[in-house]
């Protein structure tokens, strides 16, 4: 994949949603919660006012409505601004 986010944006691959509950109940796709955790795949160069803190390979937590979902080569990703990321874990 050859994609480079611009400015202060990052490309994140969301973690897989849970397939079943702790008690063993299988969760259908329509009822799955959107994951709030993912891996940073690529980062932009930042802006003159804001340096990029994130780097490729970081695992991050982000807000429920952060970014824009896209699909590349059959995989789902989210492009978001660095300040939409809540924490590095």
Curated annotation (Swiss-Prot):
GO terms for biological process: chaperone cofactor-dependent protein refolding. Together with the chaperonin GroEL, plays an essential role in assisting protein folding. The GroEL-GroES system forms a nano-cage that allows encapsulation of the non-native substrate proteins and provides a physical environment optimized to promote and accelerate protein folding. GroES binds to the apical surface of the GroEL ring, thereby capping the opening of the GroEL channel. Its main location: cytoplasm. One of its GO terms (molecular function) is protein folding chaperone. This is Co-chaperonin GroES. PROSITE patterns: CHAPERONINS_CPN10. Pfam families: Cpn10. Heptamer of 7 subunits arranged in a ring. Interacts with the chaperonin GroEL. It is found in: Cytoplasm. GO terms for cellular component: cytoplasm. Keywords: Chaperone, Cytoplasm. It comes from Porphyromonas gingivalis (strain ATCC BAA-308 / W83). SMART domains: Cpn10 (SM00883).
């Amino acid at each position: 994949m050859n994609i480079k986010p611009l400015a202060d944006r990052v490309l994140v691959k969301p973690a897989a949603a849970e397939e079943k509950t702790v008690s063993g109940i299988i969760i259908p796709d329509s009822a799955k919660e959107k994951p709030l955790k993912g891996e940073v795949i690529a980062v932009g160069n930042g802006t003159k006012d804001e340096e990029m803190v994130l780097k490729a390979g970081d695992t991050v937590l982000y807000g429920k409505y952060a970014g824009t979902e896209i699909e590349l080569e059959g995989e789902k990703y989210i492009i978001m601004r660095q300040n939409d990321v809540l924490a590095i874990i």
